Amino acid sequence: TSLWSAGFLPGIHQGTQFRAQGDPVLFLSNPPGVQPSDRQRQLSALRSLNDLRARQTLDPAAAVRSSQYDLALRMQSSVPELLALNEESQHTLTQYGASAGQPSFAANCLLARRMIERGVRTVELFDADWDHHASIHTALPRKCREVDRPIAALIRDLRQRGLLQDTLILWISEFGRTPLQQGGTAATAGRDHHKDAFTMWLAGAGVRPGMSLGATDDFGMDIAERPVHVHDLQATVLHLLGLNHEQLTWRYQGRDFRLTDVHGQLLHEILL
């Protein structure tokens, strides 16, 4: 849950997880026999109790609960419409490689576009099965085919709808893979985790297109030119969001924190 938690921010900024199977958002539907009017009365009573608790304890979590319940109530009507991918044209579904009612990374990319259209500020997509310690020669091409088409469709779709200029896209993982074979024969071998050199890409708002920054050695083992630390990336993303990473602080457990700690330099080369 830390991947979409509010972190240092107030709990109202906590992300909402959408699931690929079953109810897309847990506990969003009313239990059997509970009418919308019943739920309204329940929430009104809860709001009174939470407000009383917040005044008594000055606990930020108590103050946030009412807002979270109100958000859940609004989502009961908005989420079904949001998830109705069958409203999209067949041309759009084909562009993404998605099928209505079938969970996939392609469907998630299309869902991301629908969220952005409706004003959702941050969307995070996850894709699994990239940990190729074995059979990388067959597994990696398969994974690339699964993601390449919908990613391209998402960028193209956002541009055509005039949304890309205000949307920052980051494609990123927590590490790369070693350039050396790991285990097995040539046919079944994989690659191990590699934190010392890996790539990511950005597109959209404020990012210079059609360029690369930095390079590895010929083996892909070490950074050979223009190393970029994660704090540099964080500083640049905050800049694109209109925030100065050196001035943005949050008081937590008695001291002020910066999201970039005491580090971070803007990547001016990639900025428009």
Question: Model-flagged regions — what are they?
Answer:
Residues 1-272:
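Ligand-binding pockets and gating/stacking loops
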